[in-house]
Structures are given as C-alpha cells and as structure tokens.
C-alpha cells in the first residue's frame, strides 16, 4: 500500500475530517503521544523529552488487553492536547444557539449512560464530555480521546429531528464509554521506536510547516499500522447496541436510530461523493442495519415529524457551514418560491430562517427584516420557535446597528447577545455585571470571558479587561497565551504604582498567574 494511503487510514482512526494542518498534528499526537503519557501516568512525574521516554519504554504503547491498559487520566491528557489544537482552528465554532440545542440532546444521553452504568465512575469524573462544533458542511461526527466529541454543522443540517441527532451522539458516546478509542490506540504496542520517533517529529513539524509534517509522517512508515486502526465490526455493533439503549432511556424515539440509518444507507447507495465522511469511518453493514431494525418495538412504524425549532436550527447550521456568496443568494431565493406557501410549517420555517440569516450575512438588512416578519407570523404560537425568531431578530438588529431591547430570557444565547447589545448602547457596566455572574459558575466559557473583556475595556477598566482576556485563553487551554496576558497585567500594576490601581483585581491576577504558570509547566512537559 502507498504511504499516502496509510496516512489517510491513520486519519480515519478518529472518524474525523479536519483541516490538513490540524489533522496531521492530531494523527501524530495519537500515534506517539501515548508513549510519554503512559510513562508519566505510571511515574507521576512529567516527561521533558518525549523521544527519550519512548526509548526508555522500549518504544511500546500500552495494551488494553492486559493490566498495562491506557489509564483514563492519560487518555484525558491526550484528549486535552487534541482539543487545544481544535480550539485554535478557524473552523472551530462556538455558536450559542446551536450549542444549546445540541446540549439539550446531549445531557439526557449522558444521564441515561450514567443510569445504565455504561461509564465507569473514573471516566465519568475524569473525561471532558464536551461537544465541539466544526464549521464544516460534510456529514460527520466523531469521538476523540478523553471524552471530547466533534460535530460538523453539516450533520446538524441534514438530520430531520432531534431523535436522529440523538442516535448519532449516543453511538459516538458509546465508543468512548466502551473504551474503543483507547483499545485501538493501545494496539500499537509493537511499533518500533524509530516509527514512534518519526511521529513525534511529525508533531513538531506540523506546528511550523504542514508539508514537512506530512513528509515526516509518510517517512515514518505509517503503513506498518494500516490494518489495525479502524473501529472493528464488533465495536460498531457494540456502539449501536449500547447507543440504542442510552438513546431510548434518554427519552428519544427509537425510530430515530432507524431513520438515521436509512439516511446513511441511501447516501451509501448513491456512491458517496465525499460529503458523508461518517460513512467511511462508520461503514454500514447488513448486520448492523438488521440488528437495529430488530430492536424496534413491535407495532406500527412511527413517523417522526420535524418541529419548527429543529427546522430552524438545521437551517442555521446549513447557512453557517456554507456562507459563500452563491450559497447565500440561493438561501434567499428559496424564500421567494411561490410553492413555499403550500409547504409544511417546518419547511417554511427552515427556508425563512435561512433566508433571514443569509440576508444578514450579505448585509441586505431591509430584505432580512421583511423575511423576519414572515417568520415571526409563522412561529408566534410556538414558544421555542418564537424564541429562536427573537434571537435572530436581535442578531439582525445588532448587525445593522438598530436599537434593540435587551433580551430577558435566561439562556446563554440571550446572555451573550444582550452583553453585546448593552456594551454597544453604552451600558457596559450592566453587561459586565451579568457576565461576571455567569463566569463565576461557568469559568470555561471563553466567549463570555471575551465579551467581559470588551465590556471592561469600554468602561476603561483595562486591568479587568486584561484578566478577562487571559481567562478566555485559560478556558481553551492556551496557557502560554494566558500567562502572557497575566504578566501584562502585573506589568501594568507595577508601572501605575498606587495611583488608581484596583488592588483586588491585581491580587486576583497574581494568584491566577501562579496557578496558570503551573499548568503551563505541566503542558510543556507533555510535549
């Protein structure tokens, strides 16, 4: 097999279609990172030279077939390293509306998995259980080490209801709770030190020169592990079985699993053109399809309807993942189709929502307001859909510079939008107060910290703005960047002397700088 094919096969380990630079780094981290991580986990000490650590361990990674299985703590550290790369990627998206909708599907699945004892207490506590959105229109979702999960907007855009989305998320969650990724990684215990060394060099090269990284990875003879990295058929069937149980116990309709399989099967029959990478990493087999169909409860087949809310969320995902000029014009044109009047309410809501958002993106605010009025009339009697209409209206008003009332609902989307509105209206103190209350209980919300930095700066509170900027970086595990900002705050305090210094804020910065310094040292030792 050509070396390039082998590298592509390695990429499919994580069922992930990432940008080339990030994909090379992630692959290298997966294939070599566990050498030093495993040594570190066993010794309790950091490892300053990963290549030396691999040589000291005989070049072997742990095997889950025996007692040297990859520890949950080591897997979480590996997941953190990958997540840090994803946070920095331009395709990473923190969209409050989409994330909230996905989280309302995700949380019942987590609760059901715990209730069924599918996850051990150790991984329940140690793993992140975090979903990260990718601005990619391909249909894909993937599990990463340490309880991180990726979800492409393309998948949100094609599922017809929350039950289909739940089936995919439950399947991916089950790959993690059943330790499939850990088992796959740990199979590589027989690789030679020179191969693992080449992969380590690939990590270093990926940060500076993607082409060099690709050459190093190919030169490392990745073909040696080609046949060992796919999820096995048994793993796929196990993820189906466990995921089905988690999904149904979580309150979702079992028909969602079947209808999602039908979508994937149709795509497979149509000779997938690359927009369904999920099919390549999770190939459908007749056994998988028959097994899921056999799990359906007896009785008539239930047809799952698309709610207005889901239709609007899917439309948002489609527009945000495909915002080229031609695509935006097409979204707007669909709203002018006379046949739309006879379509289902869900179809109308989807088209109108997408058209409003597309018009906003093209800065045709007059057209956007006209379309928004049509959407408002359609959704007024459905509270959840009306809420999405109100949020979209606030986004439009903010983008067009129109005065808009502050949103009062208590959700994260309202909070983040209201903070921007208040700051823009010269009411930054109110925005700061709301954001401070939020980050006190949600310290890993990088977007909230960034808005707090903007609100603090608008009030002339530069020291608080610097700290908020630093905390945003901490939330995404960019400890080097955070430490740089904390040090900038300390320098500001020293230069100001006692004149106008917020001593409480200065004390907080000193404390946080020391804590982040330790995190930065630990992070450096893992490289």
Residue ranges, per PLM feature:
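Catalytic Zn2+-binding segment of zinc metalloproteases
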Residues: 163-164, 173-190
């Amino acid at each position: 097999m050509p070396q390039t094919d082998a590298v592509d096969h390695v990429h499919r380990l994580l069922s992930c279609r990432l940008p080339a630079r990030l994909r090379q780094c992630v692959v290298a981290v997966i294939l070599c990172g566990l050498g030093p991580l495993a040594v570190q986990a066993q010794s309790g000490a950091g490892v300053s030279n990963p290549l030396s650590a691999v040589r000291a361990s005989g070049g072997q990674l742990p095997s889950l077939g025996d007692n040297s299985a990859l520890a949950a703590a080591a897997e979480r550290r590996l997941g953190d390293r990958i997540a840090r790369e994803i946070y920095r990627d331009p395709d990473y998206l923190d969209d409050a509306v989409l994330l909230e909708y996905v989280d309302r599907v995700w949380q019942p699945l987590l609760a059901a998995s715990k209730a069924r004892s599918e996850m051990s207490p150790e991984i329940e506590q140690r793993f992140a259980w975090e979903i990260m959105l990718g601005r990619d229109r391909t249909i894909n979702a993937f599990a990463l080490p340490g309880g991180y999960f990726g979800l492409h907007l393309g998948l949100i855009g094609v599922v017809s209801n929350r039950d289909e989305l739940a089936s995919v998320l439950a399947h991916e969650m089950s790959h993690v709770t059943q330790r499939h990724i850990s088992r796959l990684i740990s199979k590589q215990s027989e690789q030679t030190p020179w191969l693992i060394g080449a992969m380590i060099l690939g990590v270093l090269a990926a940060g500076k020169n993607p082409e060099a990284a690709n050459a190093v990875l190919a030169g490392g003879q990745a073909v040696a592990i080609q046949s060992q990295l796919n999820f096995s058929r048994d793993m796929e069937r196990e993820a189906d079985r466990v995921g089905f149980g988690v999904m149904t116990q979580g309150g979702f309709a079992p028909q969602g699993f079947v209808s999602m399989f039908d979508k994937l099967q149709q795509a497979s029959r149509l000779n997938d053109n690359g927009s369904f990478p999920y099919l390549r990493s999770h190939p459908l087999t007749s056994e998988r399809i028959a097994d899921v169909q056999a799990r359906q409860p007896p009785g008539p087949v239930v047809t799952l309807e698309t709610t207005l809310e889901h239709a609007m969320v899917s439309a948002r995902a489609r527009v945000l993942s495909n915002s080229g000029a031609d695509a935006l014009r097409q979204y707007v044109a669909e709203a002018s189709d006379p046949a739309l009047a006879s379509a289902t309410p869900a179809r109308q809501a989807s088209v109108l929502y997408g058209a409003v958002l597309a018009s906003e993106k093209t800065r045709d605010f007059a057209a956007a307001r006209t379309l928004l009025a049509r959407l408002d009339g359609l959704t007024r009697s459905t509270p959840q859909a009306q809420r999405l209409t109100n949020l979209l209206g606030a986004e439009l008003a903010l983008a067009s510079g129109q005065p808009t009332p502050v949103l009062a609902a208590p959700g994260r989307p309202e909070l983040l939008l209201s903070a921007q509105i208040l700051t823009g209206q010269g009411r930054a103190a109110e925005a700061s107060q709301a954001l401070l209350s939020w980050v006190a209980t949600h310290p890993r919300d990088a977007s909230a910290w960034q808005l707090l930095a903007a609100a603090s700066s608008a009030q002339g509170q530069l020291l608080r703005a610097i700290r908020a900027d630093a905390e945003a970086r901490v939330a995404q595990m960019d400890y080097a960047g955070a430490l740089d900002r904390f040090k900038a705050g300390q320098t500001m305090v020293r230069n100001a002397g006692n004149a106008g210094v917020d001593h409480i804020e200065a004390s907080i910065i000193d404390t946080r700088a020391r804590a982040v310094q330790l995190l930065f040292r630990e992070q450096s030792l893992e490289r």
